[in-house]
Regions:
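Flexible acidic/glycine-rich loop/turn elements at helix↔coil and beta-strand↔loop transitions
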Residues: 12-17
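Structural core segment of the AMP-binding/adenylate-forming
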Residues: 47-48, 75-146
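Conserved AMP-binding/adenylate-forming core of the ANL superfamily
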Residues: 2, 18-63, 67-71, 88-93, ...
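Acidic, amphipathic alpha-helical patches
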Residues: 9, 92, 144, 154-155
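Conserved pre-ATP/AMP-binding loop-to-beta segment of ANL
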Residues: 129, 149-167
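Alpha-helix N-cap/helix-start capping motif
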Residues: 63-64, 108, 164
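Aromatic/hydrophobic pocket-lining residues that form π-stacking "cages" and hydrophobic walls in ligand
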Residues: 9, 69, 114
């Protein structure tokens, strides 16, 4: 068995689909729900031109969406790039450029920072905005919930055990 995170979590999802996988406050997801949501995000990543070894920045606070995004990246054999929530525009631009990120997941609370740097990052193919309690929103990102509501789950794939999974 391939011991990549995605392959392992898919196997767990098959074995105990109704058991709790993620708990964040009152938001509880089963392994089946975790797998389906990540598969839908993975479909969106692929549709936007990402593939094996693509780097994807995660500019999210601790949340279920963070882990779902990370799982989606692992599903396409990509590499998640963690982004410190304290980073300001110059640091964000530097990290996103130098990590070769092709997509970014971000919470709405950071939308002003994202709005300020987007035009200087033409290699980013997909911006995914995750709503939070900040009541901020931007017009630059695809809404996370729209992806969950409208995409079909990605078919499972065989993964390369030598893929870079963390930078």
């Amino acid at each position: 068995m391939n011991l990549s995170f995605a392959s392992l979590w898919e196997k767990i999802s098959d074995l105990i689909p109704e058991e709790d996988a993620l708990i964040c406050g009152d938001d509880v997801l089963s392994w089946r729900e975790f797998d389906i949501r990540a598969s839908k995000l993975a479909s969106a990543l692929i549709e936007n031109g990402l593939s094996k070894n693509s780097k994807v920045a995660i500019y999210l606070n601790n949340s279920n969406e963070y882990l779902i995004a990370q799982y989606a990246i692992f599903k396409i054999d990509g590499c998640p790039i963690n982004v410190n929530y304290r980073y300001v525009e110059d640091e964000l631009t530097y990290l996103l450029e130098n990590s070769d990120s092709e997509a970014v997941f971000f919470h709405s609370t950071y939308s002003n920072r994202i709005d300020n740097i987007k035009s200087s990052l033409p290699n980013i193919k997909l911006w995914v905005e995750v709503d939070d309690s900040s009541q901020k929103s931007s017009a630059i990102g695809v809404n996370y919930q729209n992806i969950i509501d409208n995409y079909q789950p990605m078919a499972r794939i065989e993964r390369d055990p030598n893929t870079i999974y963390m930078l």
